Amino acid sequence: MLLELAQWFAGDIRLLNVFSYITLRTVLAALTALIISFIVGPAMIRKLTAYKIGQAVRDDGPQTHLVKAGTPTMGGALILVSIAITTLLWADLSNRYVWIVLITTLGFGMIGWVDDYRKVVYRNPKGLSARAKLFWQSAIAILVALYLVLTAELPAQTTLIVPFFKQVAVPLGVTGFVALTYFVIVGTSNAVNLTDGLDGLAIMPTVMISSALAIFSYVAGHAVFAKYLGMPHIPQAGELAVFCGALAGAGLAFLWFNAYPAEVFMGDVGALALGAALGIVTVIVRQEIVMLIMGGVFVVETLSVMLQVASFKLIGKRIFRMAPLHHHYELKGWKENQVVVRFWIITMMLVLFGLSSLKLR
């Protein structure tokens, strides 16, 4: 919106031409989302508390978590509102990728909102059934995947890029692309949701990864940089850096309220949406394998749940004291802050390793 206004008046005020730079708008998007979240956050927390939109805590979980019962949840709505407003303000609204990412993010956010609403307002601990949740996640992911593959103009837009190797790409075809896109979006969405079990645990890795994806998006959308770094050039993908900047800014502000001891939880409305956002951006800029590296904490948390369930069903024994993995370490004696910060450190190292793929080819 502001970009269009700047372009309209650029002939009279040449200084406005600076808004054509994606890098500047990415920084401004991050700052805008940060400020919106900081301003709106306290009021939202007061409203959630007044309406008793509180988190239920599982009885079989770590006993230290019982004090969290009643903490306001559904705070992820704050993140989504900040991202949406900021993206509409600073991104190029004629760019189709901007709308694809926004629609996907808000679509998954709506699924999470219904789930949270049923849990909190209707006092239904199960919320939206797993089958219904997966159905709607699948519907959105498949529709988005079909749109992307059927409107692709370049082979690079539908190939699997292998990082750390020059010009190594695997053609996926329509079926392969749709399948991979489905698993990346739905998988990342649910992985972030599973990880969101401790104060600040999920949001900081999300901020780190979205910041890295902003760099990948900018490079992918820049023909010269993409060629120099051996990355596929995806026309118009650079504009996603603005969205990623907004996500990082909103997420960082949310961490202010979500840090231990948390004043608010993001709930499924935030976790499912943010995971889907990371997933769809990853797909568009063709960095699925790099995302697997950078999101290593999310991957391991998800695998811990899968292994725990499989082990118990097959041999009647549990591999971990409790799943997801962060609860296992809590029961081993780690303090909540220790688990969170150590997982942050691991994510930071993985993100830096993922970013190194830009040059190490």
Curated annotation (Swiss-Prot):
Q: Broadest EC class? A: transferase
The membrane topology of this protein is:
Multi-pass membrane protein
| Pathway annotation from the record | Cell wall biogenesis; peptidoglycan biosynthesis
Biological process terms in GO annotation:
cell division; cell wall organization; peptidoglycan biosynthetic process; regulation of cell shape
* Family (UniProt): Belongs to the glycosyltransferase 4 family. MraY subfamily.
Q: What does this protein do?
A: Catalyzes the initial step of the lipid cycle reactions in the biosynthesis of the cell wall peptidoglycan: transfers peptidoglycan precursor phospho-MurNAc-pentapeptide from UDP-MurNAc-pentapeptide onto the lipid carrier undecaprenyl phosphate, yielding undecaprenyl-pyrophosphoryl-MurNAc-pentapeptide, known as lipid I.
Q: What is this protein called?
A: Phospho-N-acetylmuramoyl-pentapeptide-transferase
Species source reads Nitrosospira multiformis (strain ATCC 25196 / NCIMB 11849 / C 71)
